[in-house]
Amino acid sequence: MGKFAKKLERAIRGYTFDDVLLIPQATEVEPKDVDVSTQITPNVKLNIPILSAAMDTVTEWEMAVAMAREGGLGVIHRNMSIEEQVEQVKRVKKAERFIVEDVITISPEETVDFALFLMEKHDIDGLPVVENEKVVGIISKKDIAAREGKLVKELMTKDVITVPENIEVEEALKIMIENRIDRLPVVDKEGRLIGLITMSDLVARKKYKNAVRDENGELLVAAAVSPFDIRRAIELDRAGADVIVVDTAHAHNLKAIKAMKEMRQKVDADFIVGNIANPKAVDDLTFADAVKVGIGPGSICTTRIVAGVGVPQITAIAMVADRAQEYGLYVIADGGIKYSGDIVKAIAAGADAVMLGNLLAGTKEAPGKEVIINGRKYKQYRGMGSLGAMMKGGAERYYQGGYMKTRKFVPEGVEGVVPYRGTVSEVLYQLVGGLKAGMGYVGARNIKELKEKGEFVIITSAGLRESHPHDIIITNEAPNYPLEK
């Protein structure tokens, strides 16, 4: 047998989500009692094992806020200027900040018309009134109603309650409730305004009990960068990004690895590198905190067809996870997940968390454009290797950044629409519910036990058909089993 024929002889068999099921085990575990929290880097623990993809139709600041509030993590895409991405990170960090530091204020000598202008411009309901850096009053929209032309000092509330900067959340809430006020100025020892506490922020903090926050009480957020854009990584790190995600189609590129090593030395944030599908890549990426697995499994990705390269996702996860375990690296499975059951399978195969694109692209918080087709609402969804995304700036992800000036792009993705699915909260509720159900069947109390106890059975195409609803016309669509994908 010749050397080329031997390639086929030693070829491994690859499996993806539809090729396997998990075998049910004897269990005392109830789905309601399982712990789905997971560690994805040394310093970042999520309360649900889900990240939103760094795609320009999936994750911007609104998605990142929603993900963090539900216990996951949003990765803000890089198909924008550095300044725009930095601002997006800052918006997430400010979304539930206990003490707002960049306070919009007004002078008592200004008109109420200008006060109203400031409130509408910044989407707020009230302003501290400041003179010589000291708080002399508070003015709100209800104070201004039908009072055009008057000065702020004539209508402001003058008896202002202030608090010191070391105040605790519960104490601030108690003061606001007892005094029936919505805003609490924070002052230093000299009485100068240094921040503001609002009732809306405190209510939000109490509402989202599963939220993931940093040591300052701010929501966690990640941001994507090119392996060659060190300046972007540094700026995002300074802006407060908790995780830098190096976002490239093929992270086992030696030039990229050299650049990533340099980048790693210049940022303090935790460091995730992707994407890979070969365990040998892990040997060269040990400087990372986690690796992201997936070459071509996504619904909008054509890499496997255009380039002929990839590894079926379950096999890729398992091979990479085995190697990553040797180095103490975390594993994120990126792409190919269609149902909640696929999340269970991905974790049982060795992943610590999954990254979702398609399943979140149809949500209210996703930045994709809404369209109506035959009376039904859809949202735009495209691969970062699609022609539109590459034209906007995503070509570098596929090592085609220099092509525009000399030739046409060679896309590795498509553009389309996905059905509107409601809010992120609604979608994640179903996905996490399915994960918990799967853990109950396997007898896993937590993510670690799911990885240890999960045992696979390989199924045939007949087994797959049997797994889906059959021999029935479905009249009522289930929220976790859409008829239209």
From Swiss-Prot:
Pathway: Purine metabolism; XMP biosynthesis via de novo pathway; XMP from IMP: step 1/1. Its EC number is 1.1.1.205. InterPro entries: Aldolase_TIM (IPR013785), CBS_dom (IPR000644), CBS_dom_sf (IPR046342), IMP_DH (IPR005990), IMP_DH/GMP_Rdtase_CS (IPR015875), IMP_DH_GMPRt (IPR001093). The keyword Oxidoreductase applies. SMART domains: CBS (SM00116), IMPDH (SM01240). It is an enzyme of class 1 (oxidoreductase). GO terms for molecular function: IMP dehydrogenase activity; metal ion binding; nucleotide binding. The keyword Phosphoprotein does not apply. K(+) binds at G296, G298, C301, E466, S467, H468. One of its GO terms (biological process) is GMP biosynthetic process. Pfam families: CBS (PF00571), IMPDH (PF00478). NAD(+) binds at D247, G294, I295, G296. The active site is at C301, R397. It catalyses: IMP + NAD(+) + H2O = XMP + NADH + H(+). Gene3D superfamilies: Aldolase class I. Homotetramer. Catalyzes the conversion of inosine 5'-phosphate (IMP) to xanthosine 5'-phosphate (XMP), the first committed and rate-limiting step in the de novo synthesis of guanine nucleotides, and therefore plays an important role in the regulation of cell growth. Belongs to the IMPDH/GMPR family. This is Inosine-5'-monophosphate dehydrogenase. It comes from Pyrococcus abyssi (strain GE5 / Orsay). The lineage of its organism: Archaea, Methanobacteriati, Methanobacteriota, Thermococci, Thermococcales. The gene is guaB.
